[in-house]
């Protein structure tokens, strides 16, 4: 046994060990890219990471906001979803470029530039954000299980704890298979809502006019608050760490500028395609809300309310059916399961990057899910399985996402605008100034949303 094999053997024997290598070593540089292939074949080889990133833009937390936006204000807020998606494309492209150019993910680069104490602080903040995301997915999955299989909410919450078994299976299949499974679940969500929107028969003229920003958005207080909710949820902090890492999964020459440029090109195309799908899903949700519920005065602030409304002919008319409700619940479950993968990978990335500590992925999942599931169980037991009260926890958990947002966006913009770090791949002036404008605006919006959530804003 040579020295490297002995080191690898000792590494696997330890439960916790020092992470001083490449980002997510399990998947880094593992996906082959065909040599001298054409555009489409090369693009297919790079497709995948974007799907994992897009999951964060169509999570259950966004569903309620989008459907409520349509139900209350018809198609007016489609323009807000469009602007939000363009912002997401910009920031995710920057995150991927940072990873490909430097060979470090955002957490590693932040730790390298700030030091150990700041690294620990940023790790704690980011872990809270990941837990907040996990809480939302636990609630979404548990409610979906209750709606589909009539499983009591508490049992549904406990069942979600065993998704670590799913993760173990997926990691054995390889990263390319994981990407394919996530993309399939995204497709399920897309086609469920596309089918339901086709049945709803929206006025396409009104839909198209919704892409043009309306002055009412700034003058109507309720509309403005919902618009802020849509924009404020645009960037999931952990997505920037995730993308800066998994963009390095492809095999390319790390020292060749032309190879890096090629990797950036195809990675950004993949990201933009998948984020466009997320944009379509969010538009479909808003259109569904407008076509089925606008003018009905229905309370659609909860998943259960939506589920019941889709089979109520007094609300949605003749197209109401249990099948519509079932498909909605299936899409909700698919969204929750996607987080099993992305949440765990993000958690591992920030742990390795900020505190340079590495544990097995299955253990990482058990710890994150264990900490996230406790408040959900407490809420569920205390409120006797009342879905409305449990969903309030989802709303409160989003505050942590808002707090963590500047922690990821500010370093990302700083690093990608630094020529010493990025070399010829540094942000162009228009990208730099746009990114800073977006960072400041989103940070202020999230502060306002936090104040609104806790009842302090006017």
From Swiss-Prot:
Its biological purpose: H(+)-stimulated, divalent metal cation uptake system.
Q: Which GO terms describe its biological process?
A: iron ion transmembrane transport
Listed A to Z, the keywords are: Cell membrane, Ion transport, Membrane, Symport, Transmembrane, Transmembrane helix, Transport
What are the recorded GO MF terms, alphabetically? cadmium ion transmembrane transporter activity; manganese ion transmembrane transporter activity; metal ion binding; symporter activity
Membrane topology, as annotated, equals: Multi-pass membrane protein
| The family this protein is said to belong to | Belongs to the NRAMP family.
Can you name a GO cellular component term? plasma membrane
Where is this protein localized, as stated in its record?
A: Cell membrane
Reply yes or no: does the keyword Ion transport apply.
yes
- The record lists the organism as Latilactobacillus sakei subsp. sakei (strain 23K)
Q: Where are the transmembrane segments?
A: 38-58, 86-106, 119-139, 151-171, 180-200, 223-243, 275-295, 315-335, 370-390, 395-415, 436-456
Spell out the protein name for this chain.
Divalent metal cation transporter MntH
Matching entries from NCBIfam families are given as:
nramp, Nramp_1, PRK00701.1
Entry-linked InterPro entries: NRAMP_fam (IPR001046)
